[in-house]
Curated annotation (Swiss-Prot):
Pfam families: Pkinase, Ribonuc_2-5A. Residues 1-30 form the signal peptide. It comes from Arabidopsis thaliana. The gene is IRE1A. Induction: By ER stress inducer tunicamycin, by salicylic acid (SA) and by bacterial pathogen infection. PROSITE patterns: KEN, PROTEIN_KINASE_DOM, PROTEIN_KINASE_ST. This is Serine/threonine-protein kinase/endoribonuclease IRE1a.
């Protein structure tokens, strides 16, 4: 017998001694008294505190009335706690006027359809000549062909983001894109944009339209609305006992955080004339799922199912142990656990001794830690609100089946162990697959759930924009929150460094190990397909059209965020991601510390929580001053400088940047060869936030103009100053000519070829120190390019790119100096509005 058998024998005798005491009841029938199972979720009391009040039902409920107004009501008195309107009634019915003027008309035609609301105590009555349908039965029949026409169905969805505590309407999402209705519904709010209990009410309007088979005209249409609610907060906000977050003392939300429920409304019966058959010649089409069955779209929240499971546990508990005192039950179980743990310890130690003596194993086995096992066994909280796309909530199981073993499944997410990037506060980004699509999985420590859900809220608000990273869903386990985000190729920082072939000597100078160098080579190799065939700089260091396009993408993303009232607050090259489709595009990401301002707010105040990254923050952020949208514009200036100069910073090296930002010690020498960039960056880095341009103004800056627009502006400017009289002391002409030393740098004929000067001298005389005369030359040669001699055409190049480059190389500061004068004196004139107004460009 093996040496550990005596220990097993002792354990067996001990269990025999304990078994009579364990199995004998204290008296009384086992079915008389039951004890509820205590949930083992974090933050609740231990099993020693098992005596507690039984869980109570929610004392509030969400309902909707006939007018489409959603209420949170306290039970049992049905007292409204808050309410908001969704803008239109629950149902609408239109019936075309009947034609009763024909010769055969003997009686007034009855309506095809009658819609009736039922009270709780009223049953659906029958009406002669009509057949009663429930909403589910009626809408399940679409589309169809009847003897008198065709019935078609459609569906639109709206989502209303509400503060669950106050009922304040935060935002409206409409699949129809009706921004006028959206703006009319949302009232300005002065409170903090982030709320702990964001409640999303989804309204689905299902519409049937019946058209006459003979005339093709609309006979009738019927629209009925269905409401669904999802509470988007983290489950840690739940109050326990299967109750949602507490609104005030004794009042709780009717659903748990992360769950969804139907919003109940008045019951409707639809009466249809018998001569309107509803069950013939069905046309193939997807049904209106939310009318098929309540569980086919979204099961009810966890509260109801968990109570059923709890009742089953209570029965098993009573049947197995009888009417036992919890303390008497606990003592032998604890003792038994101690004995078993001692046994396991001895067994494992002896087993390890044997394995050491036997030598190393020939076959390694994959073993998972207890922590990983727990993560895999953690049930998926409740019906999670996974995805908003085009205003609709998309649910369902993930059909993805991966043969990969290097990862694990969390709800709908397959999380790979391959790490993409690391961030602050324990944030790590992994590869993953969510509902069959490759995603980047941002893993945040669960204690930072506010950051995660704030990021989700702002990603939802800014969804569907090509320059904002897409959010697909969220999953949880015991320790982390997992955000499934759009998968991109690399960051802007990686792209620039890879393109410049960030040398190995630079890596070695930073004291990286040989392994680090090897890893960086792998990174460069992985991006070779992205940078191959793309040019980011022209000869001479000017940004290429592709680089300008990427920087314009960044600005477009900021414009979109600022229009929504969202301030990013952490803009830097690492948070700009690059996506490769037909061409490269830039997308803003990492909105964990972003803030959303209501419409009547101009700033975030002096104590806005969270801070951006060192070296990329505006001075008012570093000094904890009043923060506005201008903080993003300062960071944008640093990013543009960093991109154009190839990873250089306008405020110096890493350690000195914050100090230099506060002292306004900026060095723009490296971009002075690109005057348009130098002008824009200097304005963006202005220490006074009120003097920085807005995102829309940046988008219209000459730095982002193409050759055609640059030439068009110079031609319009020439036309404008051509009629000005020098003797009349023209302000605009004086301002224009005063910039000549900078814009021209001497006499402009000295910078043009003799053959070109000879050609223009045939027609008129010019003043070679005058900007007006130089603009006249550019305008005339541009307007008559086809009539120029072949040698002159070859010299100035093709229109517009070649022609623009010819003069831009010789007079690099001409455009920006003329732009400044026109901006100051003529920006409101009709001819120049397209260069300064976003609604025109």
């Amino acid at each position: 017998m093996p040496p550990r058998c005596p220990f097993l024998r002792h354990l067996f005798f001990l269990l025999l001694l304990l078994s009579p005491w364990i199995m004998s009841p204290c008296g009384g029938a086992a079915d008389d008294v039951t004890y509820p199972i205590v949930p083992s979720s974090p933050g609740r009391r231990s099993i020693l505190q098992i005596r507690r009040e039984p869980p109570t039902e929610p004392n509030t409920k969400l309902v909707v009335d006939r007018d489409g107004k959603v209420f949170l009501k306290q039970q049992p008195k049905e007292t409204p706690y808050w309410s908001f309107s969704t803008g239109s009634p629950m149902h609408s019915l239109y019936q075309a006027p009947a034609n009763n003027n024909t010769e055969n008309a003997t009686e007034i035609t009855r309506p095809h359809i009658i819609v009736e609301y039922l009270n709780n105590s009223k049953a659906a009555t029958t009406v002669d000549g009509y057949h009663n349908w429930t909403v589910q039965e009626f809408f399940r029949q679409k589309p169809l062909v009847t003897d008198d026409g065709v019935t078609l169905g459609s569906e639109t969805t709206s989502a209303y983001l509400v503060d669950g505590r106050s009922g304040r309407l935060i935002h409206v999402y409409k699949s129809t894109g009706d921004t006028k209705i959206t703006n009319a519904l949302v009232k300005p709010a002065s409170t903090e944009d982030f709320v702990n209990e964001p409640l999303l009410i989804r309204r689905t309007d299902s519409k049937l339209e019946h058209f006459s088979k003979t005339t093709g005209k609309l006979v009738w249409n019927l629209t009925v609305s269905h409401f669904r609610a999802a509470l988007l907060c983290d489950p840690v906000f739940n109050s326990g006992y299967d109750l949602g977050p507490k609104l005030q003392t004794g009042i709780y939300m009717p659903l748990l955080c992360g769950s969804q429920i139907d919003v109940r409304g008045p019951e409707i019966v639809i009466r249809v004339l018998h001569d309107q058959p509803m069950n013939v010649k069905m046309l193939p089409s997807p049904s209106l799922n939310h009318f098929e069955s309540e569980n086919s779209i979204m099961p009810f929240g966890k509260a109801r199912e968990s109570r059923k499971l709890q009742e089953q546990h209570k029965q098993k508990y009573t049947y197995l142990f009888g009417q036992w005192s919890p303390v008497k039950l606990l003592a032998p179980l604890v003792l038994l656990g101690v004995v078993v743990s001692v046994f396991i310890k001895k067994f494992s130690s002896r087993g390890s001794d044997v394995s050491l003596k036997a030598g190393p194993s020939k076959k390694k086995k994959n073993r998972k830690s207890a922590k990983d096992t727990n993560r895999q066994s953690v049930p998926r909280g409740q019906d999670q609100f996974e995805l908003i796309e085009g205003g609709q909530m998309l649910l369902g199981f993930n059909n993805f089946q991966s043969g990969a073993t290097d990862g694990r499944k969390i709800g709908k997410l397959f999380l790979s162990s391959k790490e993409i990037a690391k961030g602050s506060n324990g944030t790590v980004v992994f590869e993953g697959i969510y509902e069959g699509r490759p995603v980047a999985v941002k893993r945040l420590v669960r204690s930072h759930h506010e950051v995660a859900f704030k990021e989700i809220q702002n990603l939802i608000a800014s969804d569907q924009h090509t320059n904002i990273i897409r959010w697909y869903g969220v999953e949880y386990d015991q320790d982390f929150v997992y955000l499934s985000l759009e998968r991109c190729t690399c960051s802007l920082d990686d792209l620039i460094k890879s393109y410049l072939e960030f040398s190995m000597t630079k890596v070695l100078e930073n004291n990286d190990s040989t392994e680090g160098v090897a890893a960086y080579k792998i990174q460069l190799d992985s991006l070779e397909g992205v940078i191959k065939g793309n040019n980011f700089w022209k000869v001479g260091g000017h940004p290429s059209p592709l680089m300008l396009k990427l920087m314009r993408d960044i600005v477009c993303g900021i414009v979109h965020l600022h229009e929504l009232g969202i301030v990013h607050r952490d803009l830097k090259p690492q948070n700009v991601l690059i996506s490769k489709d037909m061409t490269l595009s830039a997308k803003l990401s990492d909105m964990g510390i972003s803030k959303r301002m209501s419409r009547d707010m101009s700033s975030l105040g002096h104590l806005a929580t969270g801070s951006g990254s060192s070296g990329w923050q505006a001075p008012e952020q570093l000094l904890q001053g009043r923060q506005t949208r201008a903080v993003d514009m300062f960071s944008l200036g640093c990013v543009i400088f960093y991109t154009i100069t190839g990873c250089k910073h306008p405020f110096g090296d890493d350690l000195e940047r914050d100090v230099n930002i506060v002292k306004n010690k900026v060095d723009l020498f490296l971009v002075e060869h690109v005057p348009e960039a130098s002008d824009l960056i200097s304005r963006l880095l202005n220490p006074d936030p009120d003097l920085r341009p807005s995102a829309t103004e940046v988008l219209l800056h000459p730095m982002f103009w193409n050759s055609e627009m640059r030439l068009s502006f110079l031609r319009d400017a020439s036309d404008r100053v051509e009629l000005e009289n020098r003797e009349a002391d023209s302000e605009i002409l004086k301002a224009m000519e005063s910039t000549a030393p900078v814009a021209i740098g001497g006499k402009w004929d000295e910078k043009l070829e003799p053959v070109f000067i000879t050609n223009i001298g045939r027609y008129r005389r010019y003043k070679y120190d005058s900007i007006r005369d130089l603009l006249r030359v550019i305008r005339n040669k541009l307007n008559h390019h086809r009539e120029l001699p072949p040698e002159i055409q070859e010299l100035v190049g093709t229109v517009p790119e070649g022609f623009d480059e010819y003069f831009a190389v010789r007079f690099p500061k001409l455009l920006i100096e003329v732009y400044r004068v026109i901006s100051l004196h003529c920006r409101e004139e009709e001819v120049f509005r397209k260069y300064f107004k976003c609604d025109i460009i």
